[in-house]
Amino acid sequence: IDAAIESKFVGYHDLTHDSKVTVLTTADALVDELKEGMEGTILVEETPFYATMGGQVADTGVIRTANAEFVVEDTIKLQGTKIGHVGKMTKGSIKVGETVTLAVDEARRNLIANNHSATHLMQKALRMVLGNHVEQAGSLVDPDKLRFDFTHFSPMTPEEIAKVEEIVNQEIQNGLDVVTNEMTIDEAKKTGAMALFGEKYGDTVRVVQMGDFSSELCGGTHVKNTSNISAFKIVSESGVAAGVRRIEALTGAGLIAHFNQVEETLKEAAALLKVSPADVVKRITALQEEVKTL
């Protein structure tokens, strides 16, 4: 691919955008046209699609013209400044030089944004509860959940987990506006914005601020207001390496689905024990006592 070809990301504000096709490829060759049924990668001048980066998964969606449709299954960074839309032509054909409409799956993007913004709130809450030694050691943000690895020397207690949840949910309820600003790395450091330990940053960085509560250097996509996240719950906390802990957590729609699943399991257990859900623990305790006397 020509080194002079670049792709500009315009997806912080626009989820639908018209742009010109600059490159088409199949798995093994550059082509002038992708036809129906073909799998390949499309590059354009400007795209609203976010490529996998900084722990945040890629956008999916469609690229279309009046007569053609390409389903985007993945978005990847190529040769630094190029963004490739990987997928399959499901209708018609698209040629190099054609103007296409790129449309990100908005519902999915919003779920990812909920989880990414919740990660920022949680990192601040972890530092408040556990101490300033907490540093991000890894992160995954997808539509279903968030996973966060951080430096800490021991398992979190139930009380510490509950306190982190309480702080995050309070800031969600507080409805903090999420504001992003671009500035030099020196300016960002002066504002006290949190940076990733060991990360190499360019001259200009993006600072994501959530009210007066959280400020971090981040290139990801976020909610406009913390109230969009709805609710937050930590579902697991475990060790992944010496001095590194991992949290998995859910927000919004993912959390409701989790609660529904847990409730269904509880109802099934209650039915098997022939008691109400509220009496499940009491019945299991009684059965354990019976077993001891056998």
For each predicted feature, which ranges?
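A glycine- and charged-residue-rich anion-binding loop/surface
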Residues: 1-294
